[in-house]
């Protein structure tokens, strides 16, 4: 997993490969899980050894997940590929 997911208004192959993690991040956020717990369990990151990196990876992927769930899903539903 990259530290920062792709940006932009197009669903990428990277997004497709990490869809499960994106959905799990959304679920964790909705359930009130701490970012540390989500980063450790869902993303497999060591929040003790690399707290800044773990926070960056978590926050940027959660942001991308939110975009996918509010906008990007339309591309998936329409069958768009890049």
Predicted regions and their residues:
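Short, Lys/Arg-enriched N-terminal segment that forms or immediately precedes the first helix
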Residues: 1-13
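Short helix/strand-capping connector loops at secondary-structure junctions
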Residues: 4, 40-53
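Short, amphipathic alpha-helical "recognition" segments used to contact nucleic acids or chromatin
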Residues: 15-31
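Major-groove recognition helix of helix-turn-helix-like DNA-binding domains
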Residues: 24-25, 48-72
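Short, charged amphipathic recognition helices of the HTH superfamily
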Residues: 31-41
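Residue-level signal for alpha-helical context at structural boundaries
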Residues: 43, 56-57, 76
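Long, charge-rich, low-complexity intrinsically disordered regions
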Residues: 77-82
């Amino acid at each position: 997993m990259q530290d920062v997911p792709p940006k932009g208004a197009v669903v990428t192959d990277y997004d497709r490969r990490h869809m499960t993690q994106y959905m799990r991040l959304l679920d964790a956020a909705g359930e009130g899980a701490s970012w540390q717990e989500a980063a450790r369990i869902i993303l497999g990151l060591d929040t003790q050894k690399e707290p800044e990196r773990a926070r960056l990876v978590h926050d940027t992927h959660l942001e991308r997940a939110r975009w996918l769930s509010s906008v990007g899903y339309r591309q998936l539903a329409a069958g768009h590929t890049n």
